[in-house]
Amino acid sequence: MLPNIQLDALLDEAGMSHAGLAVRVNRAGRARGMSLRYEHTAVARWLKGQRPRGQVPDLLCEVLGTRLRRTVTLDDIGLGVPGAPAPVHTTALCGFVERAAALWRSDAQQRPHLRGTAPVTGTPAVLPVWEWENPPEDTDVSRGGSCRVGRADTGTLRAARTHYEQMYRKAGGVATRARIVGFLNSGTAPLLRGSYSDATGRELLRATGGLVAIAGICAYDSDEQGLAQRYFHQALRLAKASGDRALGAYVVALLVNQALFMREYRQAVAFAEAALRTAGRELTPALGSDLHAMQGKAYAYLGDAGSALACIGRAEEAAGRIRPGAEPDETGYVQPGLVNVQVAEALLRLGDLPAARAQAVAAAAAPAHDRGRVHRLAVLARIELRQGDADRGVATAVEMAVQARGMESRRLRDRLRDVRDDLRGTRFGGADEAAALIEGALRVPL
């Protein structure tokens, strides 16, 4: 059951309390000969995703429409499809914008019913990728609104994406998420509701898609997997509307990474293949190398060594074609050594420790931003410890723990825990001290 953020947004816009809405619904029901006795607790259940019974959804439209002085439909209040919210991709662009903005608003206000939202699975998880791949396209994204949107506005959004990406890399997604969601709510949603031509609109949608993707990354890093998935699906819809296939492939790569984390390995393989196929000539070497590497990792977890090694070969070939300065901003995360650490994890899963260590050493030796370096050191430390090289493994673990200081990331904490657990199984003089150092870091609340 997903929270009804659209009803929540309209209730806030109407300036009604939960109790006030319940009273008005009861009153509207009496006018139709119905005896209703709803209280604020019922409204709270509706906001959590429970579908009201009988004619109550129509009464909600009537009450909110009267208060807002405009027609309010079942789709507007998130009740157009019985039992589930309307899918992101099957709505007109204007409706999608309002739904996206409703999520940003609820998230910015830290509404409790959004916390712990589970990711969708099955067809709802796959449908956004399928619809990104296939027609119809958005033929005209122009819009008439109260404020005129220009290139300066889209430039601001691109600069904001870079700013929050750097903040995420240095401080982690937990610390960054509230900041970027607040900007989406206050600085981005008004632009999407503004006035712009088709050409400017596509630039605006592309810039917004890049921002929303970073919001999804921060939610993923905060272990809010359901929210992360919703942001990624939004970013994919924005990429499709912008007409930028490469941006869409980048967003699908984020979904591949999340699928790996959630152990949906077949889905990761399929999503990576969809991105590689659909982006075609627009696929850059950096993104191609990452997609092939993650696909190889998924095959490794599925126990298909032949397919994993074939993907690793394609990843390494694509990585050799990366040219600094020739990639879009979004693929800047594919820095030297990233493919090496992805390959190291795949080889580790396949049990080839010597080859995995060689890749991990190469990854750790390459320059990387703070977050990436912690990831690489964690992988290297685990391989060294598994090979029985306790001296090097402990030293690498200590370096990792020191590097991770100041970062608020639940994903990095997972890696810290893995290394700590490996250290506890090591009989070496400094292993206990290194494990205690990591344990101390894990006690700090996020």
PLM regions and their residue ranges:
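Short amphipathic recognition helices of helix-turn-helix/homeodomain-type DNA-binding modules
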Residues: 1-24, 35-134, 414-417, 436-446
